[in-house]
Amino acid sequence: MGIKGLSQLILDEAKDSVKEDQLKNYFGRKVAIDASMAMYQFLIALKNTGMDLTDKDGEVTNHLQGLLARTTKMLEYGIKPCYVFDGKPPQLKSGELEKRKERQKEAMEQFALAQEEGDEEKMVMWNKRTTRMTKEQSNDGKKLLRLMGVPVVEAPGEAEAQCAELCKGGLVYATATEDMDALTYATPVLARHLTFSEARKQPIQEFTFKQVIEGLGVTVDQFIDICILCGCDYTDSIKGIGPKKALAMIKKYGNIENLLKNIEGKHYQAPSEFPYEEVRNIFKNPDVTPSSELVDTMKWTEPDEEGLIEFLVKEKQFDEERVRGYIKRIKSSRGKPTQTRLDGFFTPVASSSTTKKKAPAKKDDKKSATDKKRKAADASTSSKKKK
């Protein structure tokens, strides 16, 4: 879920802390990617088309296709991605996880109803909401990335917190996730939409933590309190206090303790259980592996060609010719000379307006039904494929 309304609050109140750019301008950058978030995007990408990719056992492989295509594109742009996988969530998150299960159950019931009524539009909508990342899918993603020569970090706790630790430790330039709580974990740079398909024509939205704090006119501790008041995964928020009011009240009262004293008896309603002190501690002292212990993990190596063929073609029924094409592109990307970075590409923005992108790739000649599905997946994960 992240932090409710935080991105818009920052765009409204600290617009100079947000910049837009295109993926290709991240050449030479190392980025830590929230793997679960990225793979979830890939899983639902084909839900809109009703063209789920599956293996011989009928298991969906959309996430592997998306991971292969998008990671290859990043490598071709000279970006070095590191994928960070979630570990055990904090106990305080159990309530939010239970709510997600309930929403998934409702979505499954609504999907079945839409199926009975033959309402295809609602079927697609509810089908997307039933999607959850399984442990098997997560393990398959790790296996694919390692075979591609891309580093994988398994966080002891929340992936966003581990990404932030890698960024604070100087091992990567940015945390790439859609969850705004990466900023609450004090990642120096947050890059949203980095794993989106270029076909979506949505620019990368980059937040700089130091400028966010300065723009909002608060301390780091106050920023954490604002995020808690906005609403996060670890506790319910106070009814009647949204993002802008949270900012104003923390500026006025200094912290949640003083705020609670001053709203007592008024129309604001705090949750019966409001463990804000524990939530604060989660954000300030998250369960992470120190970046100093992960230096040797952050290595990008040659792809395991035969391993990829065995896994993707023989186990997952990917088209061999297309897989070998990806392998060739990955190898070619490693042979490119290092370019000098020019950091003047970024332009500050006040809203998430789109920028022009390249036109989508032309359709290839029709082959088998399976191959057509693979092409559809490519179109949803990359706007242009190198021949």
Curated annotation (Swiss-Prot):
Post-translational modification: Phosphorylated. Phosphorylation upon DNA damage induces relocalization to the nuclear plasma.
PROSITE patterns reported in the protein's UniProt record: XPG_1, XPG_2
Binding site for Mg(2+) 1: 34, 86, 158, 160
Keywords: DNA damage, DNA repair, DNA replication, Endonuclease, Exonuclease, Hydrolase, Magnesium, Metal-binding, Mitochondrion, Nuclease, Nucleus, Phosphoprotein
Listed GO CC annotations: mitochondrion; nucleolus; nucleoplasm
Cystine crosslinks: none
Record Pfam families: XPG_I (PF00867), XPG_N (PF00752)
Biased composition (Low complexity): 378-387
Location within or outside the cell: Nucleus, Nucleolus; Nucleus, Nucleoplasm; Mitochondrion
Co-factor note (free text): Binds 2 magnesium ions per subunit. They probably participate in the reaction catalyzed by the enzyme. May bind an additional third magnesium ion after substrate binding.
Amino-acid positions noted as binding DNA in the UniProt annotation, renumbered to this chain: 70, 158, 231, 233
Official protein name in the record: Flap endonuclease 1
Family matches, as SUPFAM superfamilies: 5' to 3' exonuclease, C-terminal subdomain, PIN domain-like
UniProt similarity note: Belongs to the XPG/RAD2 endonuclease family. FEN1 subfamily.
Species of origin: Naegleria gruberi (Amoeba)
Residues annotated as binding Mg(2+) 2: 179, 181, 233
